[in-house]
């Protein structure tokens, strides 16, 4: 499967980070750690929520410069809401991802942030899109990003399977985040997860000491 690694060489306050999104049978799970750092060594916050709701059933997660990511998602939320009002219907997930793509492309010389967009809509159901530095848009059944993703590509490729149940997908996401947070010095804190289905949105927060443990920890 084609994979993408977010650029982790950032300046200023950074989200570090480990982010992911995974489709399952009937929905999608988007998740991240919660650590922010400066220069990759000083931990400026342990409780950053990197999962941003841009519409009812559409979320994005951020990697890179925190200021850049917040500015882009604020602009995206406005444009997506305006589009929804004009169309008199909820926005499609791909349309929301395309808004982020355009913002990233139009500001590619200044931005140091990448995004994963995930959600559910009535046209295509659960979807995951990677919006990379420079504005590339890629649709995938699952994706991982951020500095912590370096340590979990093998796990993700080996353990992901199509049409997982919600419970299987949650365990996959928990394990992936736990493995990355255990190895990557700029990923840590708690694990934030959001489950998105036709029925709605469910938020899950897992403290670091409640994450799955592995043999070398």
From Swiss-Prot:
GO cellular component: cytoplasm; nucleus; proteasome core complex, beta-subunit complex
CDD domains: proteasome_beta_type_6
Nucleus keyword on record: yes
Protein's GO biological process: immune system process; proteolysis involved in protein catabolic process
Keyword Ligase: no
Main location: cytoplasm
Compartment(s): Cytoplasm; Nucleus
Protein family according to the UniProt entry: Belongs to the peptidase T1B family.
SUBUNIT field: The 26S proteasome consists of a 20S proteasome core and two 19S regulatory subunits. The 20S proteasome core is composed of 28 subunits that are arranged in four stacked rings, resulting in a barrel-shaped structure. The two end rings are each formed by seven alpha subunits, and the two central rings are each formed by seven beta subunits. The catalytic chamber with the active sites is on the inside of the barrel.
Protein name: Proteasome subunit beta type-6-A like protein
Native species: Salmo salar (Atlantic salmon)
Gene designation per UniProt: psmb6l-a
């Amino acid at each position: 499967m084609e994979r993408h690694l977010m650029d982790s060489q950032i300046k200023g306050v950074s989200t570090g980070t480990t982010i992911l999104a995974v489709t399952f049978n009937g929905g999608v799970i988007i998740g991240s750690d919660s650590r922010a750092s400066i220069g990759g060594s000083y931990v400026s916050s342990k409780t950053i929520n990197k999962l941003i709701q841009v519409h009812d059933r559409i979320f994005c997660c951020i990697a890179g410069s925190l200021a850049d990511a917040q500015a882009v998602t604020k602009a995206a939320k406005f444009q997506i809401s305006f589009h929804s009002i004009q169309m008199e219907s909820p926005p499609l997930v791909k349309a929301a991802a395309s808004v982020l793509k355009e913002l990233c492309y139009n500001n590619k010389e200044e931005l140091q942030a990448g995004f994963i967009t995930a959600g559910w809509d009535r046209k295509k159901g659960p979807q995951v899109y990677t919006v990379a530095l420079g504005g590339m848009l890629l649709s995938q059944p699952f994706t991982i990003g951020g500095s912590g993703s370096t340590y979990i590509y093998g796990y993700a490729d080996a353990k992901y399977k199509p049409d997982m149940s919600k419970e299987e997908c949650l365990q996959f996401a928990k394990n992936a985040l736990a493995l990355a947070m255990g190895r990557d010095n700029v990923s840590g804190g708690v694990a934030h997860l959001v489950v998105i289905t036709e029925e709605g949105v469910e938020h899950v927060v897992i403290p670091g000491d409640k994450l799955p443990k592995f043999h070398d920890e």
